[in-house]
A protein has these predicted regions:
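Membrane-interface "cap" regions at the ends of multi-pass membrane proteins
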Residues: 1-49, 54, 71-75, 87, ...
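Helix-loop-helix connectors at the membrane interface of multi-pass transporters/channels
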Residues: 3, 92-96, 122-141, 221-225, ...
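Transmembrane-helix boundary/entry motifs in multi-pass membrane transporters
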Residues: 18-30, 55-63, 76-116, 130-137, ...
C-alpha cells in the first residue's frame, strides 16, 4: 500500500477538487492536524471511565489494538481513494464498489449518525461555553452554530487556516491536564484489573478513533503527494493512540475506581475546581473542531455523492441539526 507507483485510472490527470476548495497544497503537518482534529473529540473524556471498568493494562491494550486496527482501516480507505478517480465521500465509494445496496445502507447509517453527532456537539458546545462564560447553554449553542455555519458555507479553504492552530490548542490542553495529574497519581489506582465488564471499553474506544470522514477530506488536501497522505494517516493515528493512552492512565491514576463518566468532573473533585474549567475549555475546542470536520464531510458527501448544489448542501448540514436541536 502506497509503496509503489500507481497508474491512475484517468491516466495521471491531475486531481482537481470541486469548487476550488483545495487550490493550494497543504503541508504534511496540516494534513496530520486535519485528521487529528477529526478524530480527537469529546469522546476522549469518556476513555478513563471505560478503562476503569477493566483496569489500566486491559484498557491500554484496547486503546492500542483498536487504534492500530482503525489506522489500518484508514490506510485501506486511503488505498481506495488513491485508486479512485472520482471525487467521492464514504457514501459515494460504497455505491461505486458495492452497488445500490451499499449506497442505501451507508446513506442511512452515515447520514443518521452524522446528524446525531452534530446535534450532540451543538448541545455539548452550549453547555461547555455556558460553564466557562455564563449565560444560557441555548444562547451559546445558537451562537456556536451561527459561527460554524460561516465555515461550513465557505468550505475547507477558510477552515484550514484555523484548523492547525485549533488542533495544537486541543493537544496543548490535553497535555496540560495529563501533566497536571502526575503529582496526584497513586500507584494503587493503577494496580487492578477486572474481566467482569471486559467488552465495556470497546464501543467507547472505537467511537474515539472514528475518523474516516476526515481521512477522505485529507486526501483532497494532500492530493499531490500519496507518500505524505500515507504519512499523515500513520502519524495522526500514532499521536491519537499515544494521547488517548497517556490521558486515560493519568486520569485513572488520580481517580481510580472513582473515575467519572466525564473525566474532568472526577478530577475536579480530587485535584481542584481548576480542572473543571480546563476540562470545559478542552471540550469546547475538541467539539468545535470535530463539528466543523464532520459538517464539512457531510456537506461534501451531499455534493460529491448526490450532486446536491454546494450552498444547498451547506444549508442542509446547518439547518437539519438545528431543527432537531
Amino acid at each position: 500500500m502506497f509503496g509503489i507507483k500507481y497508474h491512475r485510472l484517468d491516466k495521471e490527470a491531475p486531481l482537481q477538487m470541486h469548487w476550488g476548495f483545495f487550490r493550494k497544497k497543504l503541508s504534511l503537518f496540516e494534513g496530520v492536524a486535519f485528521i487529528i482534529s477529526g478524530t480527537i473529540g469529546a469522546g476522549i473524556l469518556g476513555l478513563p471511565y471505560a478503562v476503569s471498568k477493566v483496569g489500566p493494562l486491559l484498557g491500554v491494550l484496547f486503546i492500542v489494538i483498536l487504534g492500530l486496527l482503525m489506522m489500518g482501516l484508514n490506510l485501506m480507505l486511503g488505498e481506495v481513494l488513491v485508486r479512485t478517480k472520482d471525487h467521492l465521500q464514504i457514501v459515494g465509494l460504497s455505491h461505486k464498489y458495492l452497488g445500490i445496496f451499499g449506497r442505501v445502507f451507508m446513506t442511512t447509517m452515515m447520514y443518521s449518525s452524522m446528524i446525531g453527532i452534530l446535534v450532540v456537539y451543538i448541545i455539548g458546545e452550549g453547555q461547555a461555553l455556558a460553564s466557562l462564560f455564563g449565560r444560557t447553554p441555548l444562547e451559546w449553542s445558537l451562537l456556536f452554530l451561527a459561527v460554524a455555519a460561516v465555515f461550513i458555507f465557505r468550505g475547507l479553504k477558510t477552515f484550514k487556516i484555523f484548523d492547525f492552530f485549533l488542533t495544537v490548542g486541543v493537544l496543548m490542553v490535553v497535555s496540560i491536564i495529563t501533566f497536571a495529574c502526575v503529582p496526584y497519581i497513586k500507584m494503587a489506582n493503577l494496580a487492578f484489573s477486572s474481566f467482569k465488564d471486559f467488552l465495556f471499553p470497546y464501543g467507547v474506544v472505537l467511537f474515539a478513533f472514528a475518523s474516516s470522514g476526515a481521512v477522505v477530506e485529507a486526501h483532497g488536501i494532500l492530493k499531490d503527494s500519496e507518500v505524505n497522505f500515507k504519512k499523515a494517516i500513520i502519524i495522526a493515528g500514532s499521536i491519537c493512540i499515544l494521547v488517548y493512552a497517556t490521558f486515560a492512565l493519568a486520569v485513572l491514576g488520580v481517580t481510580g475506581l472513582e473515575t467519572t463518566e466525564i473525566a474532568t468532573i472526577g478530577l475536579a473533585s480530587k485535584v481542584g475546581s481548576s480542572f473543571f474549567v480546563i476540562g470545559n475549555l478542552f471540550a469546547a475546542l475538541a467539539m468545535g473542531t470535530s463539528f466543523l470536520v464532520g459538517g464539512l464531510a457531510f456537506k461534501h458527501s451531499l455534493c460529491w455523492d448526490y450532486k446536491v448544489p454546494r450552498q444547498v448542501s451547506a444549508a442542509i448540514v446547518c439547518l437539519v441539526p438545528l431543527v432537531i436541536f
